[in-house]
Each structure stands twice: as structure tokens, then as C-alpha cells.
Amino acid sequence: MLLLFGASISWLDANTGAAGHPRSPLSVGQQAPDFITSDTHGNMVALKEYHGRPVVLNFWATWCAPCRQEMSTLQAVYTAHQDKGLVILAISLDAAESPDEVRAHITSLGVTFPPLLDPQGSVAAHYNIFLLPSTIFIHPAGTVAAMHIGPMNRAQVEKHLVAIMPQQG
């Protein structure tokens, strides 16, 4: 119980701006905040590298059971749509896990899209993430098309993808 309370306080701290004022909420239609963070190999990755492509940001942690369960759904969607340019970035909020441990964990789940690291929660703070899993769907133009808090099934993910995937015609 104390651990959960401490984690909640940490999330509160990460999601407040100067002098403890809450950050502005992220909303659909808004430009997605750019960020730079590292992958599990130490390479720096910026959201702007994916401008022009549909992007799914999934905030998760190895200790989050619903996050782990959702990974197979996200992998199935990625496999089905990666040839159409879909990018999924799994942003790990694990502060206590090493990059190697995060990589091993996501590999054990059968995930092939890249895990990124956000151990201090700075990327999560830009996106006002305070519950896991949370997923942001970003249109190729760089705007937020949809947001989902909590685990998703395949139908839910596919419903949100309609707003960001190129239309076949």
C-alpha cells in the first residue's frame, strides 16, 4: 500500500509544472509534444524522426500487468500494419530496471517494435500520463488523433488507427 502511495506521489510530481501547477492537458487536435529519449541500446530517438508516419505511443512498465497483457495486441496490430508505415513506440517508465532488463522483458513478450526509456517520466509528463497503460495515437501531420487510458483489445486499437492510418483507395 505504501509503495502504491509513493508511486502515486511520484506520478503527481512528474505531472506538475513549475511551483506544482498542473501541466496543460493534452487534447485531440493538438500538436504532439516532441521529445528526445533513448532506446534500450543507448541510441537517441526523437518523435520528430517519424513525422509523416502514423505513430502510436504506448506508455507502459514491466511491473504493470495490464501493460504486459496489452503488448500482444499491440504486436498483432504492428505486424498487420507496419508495411503501411505504422510506428509503435513502447515508452517504458521503469525507473528500477536497466535498459538490458527492459529489452529482455519486451523481447520475452514477443514484441518487435522498439522500446524507449523514460525512467524519470519526463516524456510521460509532456503527455500528461498518470495511469498505465496509456496510449496516444498521432496522425502523420503530427497532431494527436486519439488518446486511450487503460488496456485495449484489438478492436479498440483498430478503431483508433482509422484516424491515423493512410486510407486505401
What are the functions of these language-model segments?
Residues 51-53, 83, 111-112, 129:
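Active-site acidic short loop of glycosyltransferases
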Residues 104-112, 117-168:
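Thiol/disulfide oxidoreductase modules built on the thioredoxin-like
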Residues 45-68:
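Short active-site neighborhood of thiol/selenol oxidoreductases, capturing the structured segment around
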Residues 1-31, 169:
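N-terminal targeting signals for export/organelle localization
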Residues 68-109, 119-126:
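Structural microenvironment flanking redox-active thiols in thiol-disulfide oxidoreductases
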Residues 56-58, 90-92, 137:
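Hydrophobic beta-strand core positions in alpha/beta domains
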Residues 40, 50, 140:
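Short, ordered coil/turn segments that flank beta-strands lining enzyme active or ligand-binding pockets
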